[in-house]
Amino acid sequence: MRAAGKQLRDNQQMRIAAQQNPDGSAYTPRRPQVDDKTHKLRRSRARMFAKLSKTRWMAVRTTADSATIQFVAGAGRLANIHQHGLRDRVNKYGLQVQYPARQLLGFSDADIEMVREMLLATVGL
């Protein structure tokens, strides 16, 4: 189970880095930011969730019959907001913003097939 969990985590990390949902569609793009002084649009080319896709923030927990991939610490809160498209404050005293749903964790067809193959290889079929 541990090997399957690690492989799934690696697949999730690559997908998050590529800015894609499990079905292959692209994430909803960031909202354009406005400069407070000039009131013009800022050009931001930074990737979303750049640090969130690192191994440090994605934990694999395994038992004899299951594997779980989850975000740890404060990263879990941030990931939950984006996974489900919830409302949150931009900063401590800022406005509340409705974030679009961006599916960070999920199974693609390739992931399901990979887990199936690993389980069959373990059982010996």
List each model region and its residues.
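Short, low-complexity, charged/polar segments at coil/turn and helix-coil boundaries
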Residues: 1-92
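C-terminal or internal capping secondary-structure element at the end of a domain, subdomain, or sheet
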Residues: 94-125
